């Protein structure tokens, strides 16, 4: 077996092992959800929430969420430390939905000022994954206890999340292949006309997280280059595919 074939086999093995545990955790997460009466809708919402959190794990491990590689875990711990729990004051309502809908799902210039204190510096991820979902509109009283997220984070924290395709040196390293694999199992349905590939996922994360982050940091170093007539915009205008 060649090195390339062996690496591909190792990646597939880790991905499949992750997926088997994912199925178990998905079922457990479904059981925590309250406020959705239809079983099919509850299952779909559980899948949506775990898919959202997997995307977040990939970008937080690169430091793109307020510079914190354990962003979700730390925010959960901080909220629980306040002791202000109760209806609509748990992690799901008080923090996570606001992160999804008002943070990742909304451009920074459209956010409320108080949101920065709650979320810190987080990017805008265009594409719809973090928009208010139809299920969230149909079931406005959804509740998910903190214990559900503690369990998911414990599962996710057992893996090392990478955006690139580095050779697996350890058997707990995963890359966006795992998202493509799970989307294929849960989302790629002919009746929906929705198909996701590894390239779609990697490109989405790069376009909406890595590239904007790099431009923001570069602008801090050299603001003049980003003025309307600056060199950066000239390069982008003249040769957008290259730059």
Question: Where in the sequence are the language-model features?
Answer:
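Preference for the N-terminal adenyl/adenosyl cofactor-binding alpha/beta module
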Residues: 1-243
């Amino acid at each position: 077996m060649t090195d390339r074939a062996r690496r591909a086999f190792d990646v597939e093995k880790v991905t499949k092992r992750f997926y088997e545990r994912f199925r178990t955790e998905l079922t457990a997460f479904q059981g925590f959800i309250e406020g959705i009466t239809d079983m099919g809708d509850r299952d779909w919402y559980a899948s949506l929430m775990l898919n959202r959190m997997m995307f977040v794990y990939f970008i937080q491990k690169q430091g793109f969420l307020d510079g914190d590689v354990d962003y979700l875990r730390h925010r959960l711990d901080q909220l629980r430390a306040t002791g202000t729990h109760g209806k609509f004051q748990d992690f799901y309502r008080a923090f996570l939905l606001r992160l999804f809908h008002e943070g990742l799902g909304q451009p920074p210039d459209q956010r409320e000022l108080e949101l920065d204190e709650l979320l810190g510096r987080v990017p805008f991820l265009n594409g719809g994954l973090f928009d208010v979902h139809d299920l969230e509109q149909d079931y406005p009283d959804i509740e998910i206890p903190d214990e559900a997220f503690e369990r998911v984070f414990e599962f996710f924290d057992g893996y090392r999340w990478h955006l690139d395709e580095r050779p697996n040196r350890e058997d707990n390293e995963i890359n966006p292949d795992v998202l493509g694999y799970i989307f294929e199992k849960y989302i790629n349905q002919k009746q929906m006309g929705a198909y996701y590939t590894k390239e779609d996922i990697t490109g989405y994360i790069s376009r909406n997280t890595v590239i904007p982050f790099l431009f923001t940091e570069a602008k801090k170093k050299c603001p003049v280059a980003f003025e309307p007539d600056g060199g950066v915009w000239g390069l982008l205008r003249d040769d957008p595919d290259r730059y």
